[in-house]
């Protein structure tokens, strides 16, 4: 069972792909559920028996980074949580999924890069030799450029020394 958070355009695409890939059930969650459309509330979603959760809403996107409407810790048996939000790299939903021990928790940066790579193939009318490898490499480079390191500690505990060593390696 795939549980999709949100009802917009990305939901429609995600739902179509989930069905195409053989999902037994695809359920939709909304802040304002329409029972006639079979939509669930976030409270109901926790008890849906979902295997995979996909967030297609802007919840958790910068600057509202602490927002998370779904209690994934109360959803035993989750196999994966995917979030289309790419800024921050790890949304509150992804952080909570990792904390709950969900085996796969992935943010939206790789999806954003994949869209760009496949759009480039389309508009340039040529295929990249290894698009998946290209996507992984670009995503890794972007993460390296975006993420930072904060060293915290008491005076004279070695922050400067560690900072210099990191600067040499990064």
Identify the role of each PLM range:
Residues 20-25, 99-103, 169:
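Conserved S-adenosyl-L-methionine
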Residues 37-105:
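Rossmann-like adenosine-cofactor binding region
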Residues 1-19, 23, 153-155:
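Glycine-rich adenosine-cofactor-binding loop
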Residues 84-147:
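Adenosine-phosphate binding glycine-rich loop
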Residues 162:
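Hydrophobic positions on the alpha1 helix immediately C-terminal to the Walker A/P-loop
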Residues 159:
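Conserved lysine of the Walker
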Residues 20-38:
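NAD(P)-binding Rossmann-fold cofactor-contacting core
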């Amino acid at each position: 069972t795939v549980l999709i958070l949100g009802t917009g355009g990305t939901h429609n695409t995600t739902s179509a792909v989930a069905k195409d890939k053989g999902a037994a059930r695809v359920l939709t969650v909304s802040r304002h559920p329409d029972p006639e459309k079979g939509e669930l509330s976030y409270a109901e979603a926790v008890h849906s028996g979902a295997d995979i959760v996909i967030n297609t809403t802007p919840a958790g996107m910068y600057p509202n980074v602490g927002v998370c409407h779904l209690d994934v810790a109360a959803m035993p048996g989750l196999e994966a949580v995917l979030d289309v939000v790419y800024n921050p790299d790890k949304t509150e939903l992804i952080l909570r999924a990792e904390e709950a021990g969900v085996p796969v928790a992935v943010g939206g940066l790789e999806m954003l890069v994949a869209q760009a790579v496949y759009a480039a193939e389309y508009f340039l009318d040529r295929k990249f030799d290894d698009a998946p490898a290209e996507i992984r490499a670009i995503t890794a480079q972007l993460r390296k450029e975006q993420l930072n390191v904060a060293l915290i500690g008491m005076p004279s505990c070695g922050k400067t020394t560690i900072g210099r060593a990191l600067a040499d390696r990064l």
